[in-house]
Amino acid sequence: MERRDSGESMSSWAPGRALAAYHAGVTVICELAVRFAEDAWSAVTPCPEWRAADLAGHLRCMADDFHEYLDDAPDSRMARLMATGAHPDSLARKMARQNAAELAALPDGTGPEHIRAFAASARAYAQRIPAVWNLPHHRYRDTLVTAGGMLGAVCAEWHLHAWDLARSLGKDYCPADPDTLAAGWRAGLPQLPLDLPEDLDRPVASSRTARHPAASCAATPGTAAHRGGHGHGNLAVGVGPAPVEDSPVWAALLRASGRLL
C-alpha cells in the first residue's frame, strides 16, 4: 500500500506552520549573512571543502533547482533519480557531484550577492507551494512525496545551512520550532530516516562531541525564538562544539544530516 509523506502522522506538517518555519529559515540565513565582514566570507564551514562564500553560492543553486524540480514534477531529474530507489549513500554521492558541478558553473559573485539571489528565489518558491500542496512531487520506493512534503525537505535544508553559516561565524544556531522541522524532514526525506530520542527531555550526550564529516553539507537531496513563538531561531556565541543538548530534536536532525556523530 502506498504511503504518503513518509510519516505515520504528519498532522504537524501543515501549510501554516510549514510555511512559517520555511520563511524563518530563509530569514535567519539573511540575518547571518549580514554578520559576515567582507573577508569573513573566506571562513571555513562545517563542510571542509567549502568556504562561507561557496555555501552562499550553493544556497543560490539549490533554490533555483527546487523551482526546476517543481516545474517538472513528477518527472523531474530529481524524481527520476529518486525513482531508482537507490541506497541513500548512493543518492547522496550523486547529489554531491551535481551540487559541486552547479557551484563550479555559477557565475562569479560575492557572498552577499548570492544570498540576495537565494532569498528572492526561495521566497518565490514558497509562494508557489500552497496551490500544489497535495500534488505528487516524486517517489522513493513505496513512498510518494507531495509538493508539500518536498517543502519539508527544503525547509530542513535552509535551517541546517543556517547552522553551517553560524558555525562559520563561531556561533551556534537552534531553530525556534525543531518539532515542525522534524515533521517536515519525515514528510520530504523518506530515504533518510529520522531517529528521535525516546525521551525528548533527556539531554543528548553526543552533542558535546560534535563532528563535521566531510561532504555532509552537499549531500542531502532536497538534504522561530522558542517553541510556539514567532521568532526565527536562537543564535549564541560559541566557538566549541554546538551546545544542542537543550534540543534533542534539533540534535537528531543534525545527526541525520551528518553534522553530528
PLM regions: where:
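Conserved alpha-helical segments that form or flank metal/cofactor-binding pockets of metalloenzymes
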Residues: 53-98
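Long amphipathic alpha-helical segments that form oligomerization/scaffold cores
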Residues: 101, 105-109
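Structured surface interface patches that mediate subunit assembly and partner/cofactor docking
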Residues: 2-21, 25-28, 35-48, 68-86, ...
